[in-house]
Amino acid sequence: MMCTALSPKVRSGPGLSDMHQYSQWLASRHEANLLPMKEDLALWLTNLLGKEITAETFMEKLDNGALLCQLAATVQEKFKESMDANKPAKTLPLKKIPCKASAPSGSFFARDNTANFLSWCRDLGVDETCLFESEGLVLHKQPREVCLCLLELGRIAARYGVEPPGLIKLEKEIEQEETLSAPSPSPSPSSKSSGKKSTGNLLDDAVKRISEDPPCKCPTKFCVERLSQGRYRVGEKILFIRMLHNKHVMVRVGGGWETFAGYLLKHDPCRMLQISRVDGKTSPVQSKSPTLKDMNPDNYLVVSATYKAKKEIK
């Protein structure tokens, strides 16, 4: 069993007196959680479109809408091939997507290209909740929403023979496991790991490393327990955890994904601070599983972090 927590003695993190640094740190955490999704989608787009896209250039490459229109046209061609081979149960949109390929970033034409892509997504069946605003792409204001939209497009496209992004492949893998496997019994003592010994499994070792950083020193510990390959009990929940491209440890949460490190920041009480609205004082969360009803209305929770100076926060 892997247990992780922060000792109150060594706990550090931005408080109300450090709100500027805290805001910067929080933004860096959001970006860190988004990075695996960007990398996965960049690789998917590169393979589909033959244009090199990276996580670093993701929004910049897409922001004039031209590559998205090209993506729609490419996916349509693959749909047509699938329809010729198998009669689909649903009629798919096959139409010319108006696009100005040379549209400057930030221009009206960039917005028009993006709007045309979004219109095509609606025709395809992408739910309104998965779409982004044209401005959100053009002005780089909604990177997460752009990623979620493309993932949903990948899910739909995969039904018609289009190679999906890596995260969608992992979703299919989990769905198959849930369909084929019966409920697993409680793990035997031999399935629990402790100390620094390596399990020899890349995923298990990565989960162990993340859950034990920083080292646990609290008497009441938040536990991460391996139940079976890729299946863990984290706190009070049983979760599927996967390694994306042998690099990122991802948790299947609801209908989406989150980094394991990001999940722990939100759900491990030992990684949170309780801040008083009255005097601004911070204190550790004492409850093993804090809920809003357990908290004083004059307090609120923030995640804790090792403090970084402003110049160190990227």
Swiss-Prot record:
The modification Phosphoserine is found at S184, S188. GO terms for molecular function: microtubule binding. Residues 176-200 are annotated as: Disordered. InterPro entries: CH_dom, CH_dom_sf, GAR_dom, GAR_dom_sf. It is found in: Cytoplasm, Cytoskeleton, Stress fiber; Membrane. Keywords: Apoptosis, Cell cycle, Cell shape, Cytoplasm, Cytoskeleton, Growth arrest, Membrane, Phosphoprotein. Residues 189-198 have a biased composition (Low complexity). Cleaved, during apoptosis, on a specific aspartic residue by caspases. Phosphorylated on serine residues during the G0-G1 transition phase. Transmembrane segments: none annotated. GO terms for biological process: antral ovarian follicle growth; apoptotic process; basement membrane organization; initiation of primordial ovarian follicle growth; ovulation; regulation of cell cycle; regulation of cell shape; regulation of Notch signaling pathway. Residues 198-271 form the GAR domain. Induction: Down-regulated by mitogens. Belongs to the GAS2 family. It is a peripheral membrane protein. Expressed in most tissues. Highest levels in liver, lung and kidney. In the embryo strongly expressed in regions that undergo extensive apoptosis, such as the intervertebral tissues, the cranofacial mesenchyme and the cartilage of the limbs. Expressed in the inner ear, in inner and outer pillar cells (at protein level). Required to maintain microtubule bundles in inner ear supporting cells, affording them with mechanical stiffness to transmit sound energy through the cochlea. This is Growth arrest-specific protein 2. The record marks D279, G280 as: Cleavage. Its main location: cytoplasm. One of its GO terms (cellular component) is membrane. Residues 35-157 form the Calponin-homology (CH) domain.
